Amino acid sequence: VRAKLGFCGSFPGSLRSGTKEMGPSMRQMSLVRPVKAVALLALLALAACVQPTLSPSSSNQSLPKADTNYYVATTDAGFAIPALPVEEIPETYRRQVVAFESNEPAGTIIINPKTKLLYYVLGDNKAIRYGVGVGRAGFEWSGEAIVADRKPWPTWTPPAEMIARDPAKYSKFAGGQPGGLTNPLGARAIYLTSGGKDYGYRIHGSPEWRSIGKNASSGCIRMINQDVIDLYSRLKGGEKVVVLTASGEMPKGLYIPKT
């Protein structure tokens, strides 16, 4: 593990079925019918070379149209969240239920930085898929974590490293920026820890919805505000989070980029 603190701030005290996708922990299986002994041995030898699928992959089926009502204007805790121009959100990144094969239990969150997609596992080979923004070059991390805490309209406190890097921009928020529409954490923040340690990584909303589908953050997972509110409502705390590698493979351990 190489150490770098994430930069998302201090730790606080009717959907449709869509495309078929493969989860990172789903083992490929095959049925072998009775054949001659030599042929059977050959097939078994070949099967031994087949590796489990390690990253979600789309089939050739076309995506359904996501419900545009997900992105209408709404009021939450007194904050007026504006409607989004759905036609400008790539359909791949719109919230929708997809077929998703995974051995992970319902409630698990799987994030694929390569495809910029987050999956909330529903069970029965289905998941809710959301578009996300991920860490830019040099800030990508991977591994397993848990949901340690959740906050609506959270206060954002920039880490000392961020203030030192751009004091003119961030020093005014050294004491914390209250929750609101311009707060970088958006409408909700989901705080992650790994091995009991807080590295500063969050899944959170963002006023910069156009950054969804891009490598744009300092390591946190950005979501559209309407989407993070939906994901937040499904969590109870303690859920497993799996962040795949930058190439979309299952992580072999925790990787935190060096400062």
Question: What residues fall within each predicted segment?
Answer:
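N-terminal pre-domains immediately preceding structured catalytic cores
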Residues: 23-221, 225-259
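N-terminal secretory signal peptides that target proteins for export/translocation
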Residues: 1-33
